[in-house]
Amino acid sequence: MSKVISLSSYAPSIGSEEKAAEILHNMQTVLESDNIVVDFENVQTMGTNCAKLIFGTLYKSMDAEKFYERINFIHTTPNIRRTIRLGIEFALASGKA
């Protein structure tokens, strides 16, 4: 079973560290018992640092296979998908999220 985490309340842009930290906390709490579907409906942009904090942290806390088994994305734009990928890459390159 997966729980949907809607990011529409943060739309149209997720750019502050405070928002990213709140989203990360919510996702970590849900991941204790459920898989997640992250719904990006109405989100047009996300800062790379926000993606690094949220998805880089989660990616580094589990292996790649587990990350993609437990976290799915819907309603993403090509820009959002690229930002998520870059956030994960930057987290891995820096050695910390």
Please tell me what each predicted stretch does.
Residues 92-96:
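Helix-rich interaction surfaces within compact, conserved domain-sized segments
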Residues 11-35, 40-89:
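Amphipathic alpha-helical interaction surfaces in cytosolic regulatory modules
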